[in-house]
Amino acid sequence: DLDRLKQHFLSSTKPFQLIPISDMFNNVVCIQISDQNPSSKIRSQVFLFDDGAVIFWNVEDKYQEMIFNQLKQFSDNLYPKTLVESEKEIMNFIEISASSTLNNDLIKINCQSETELLLDKYTFSNALALSVKLGRKRKKERNMKALE
């Protein structure tokens, strides 16, 4: 329930802060983690999609676990932990002062404006979530064909 999740993070205290992306995107919640490594200039954010996909950007393991534990309160039909672990993809990214791109499995995110940075991270997050979803669907189809 994405609406209840939004309300939870709106009333949440540190380290999690709900970040509005745009009124156009109602299928996602963005959370910024504020008390990670203070020397890091790269922000730590999480995109939570209404289909269950979760995309972490520069988030320490302990905070990932905290997010997953909070998600359990607001989710129906949770995916098994083994499935979540098997579908995990780790990609590298850097923040740059040019247009965002994907080159050789390295995501380059434009950090010249906070708004553009957030929208570009949303775009890449959505693409990654769809890629994982497509991969799961194809795997399921292969398994069905193998049973025939």
Name these PLM-found stretches.
Residues D1-G135:
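Short Lys/Arg-enriched alpha/beta "domain-start" segment
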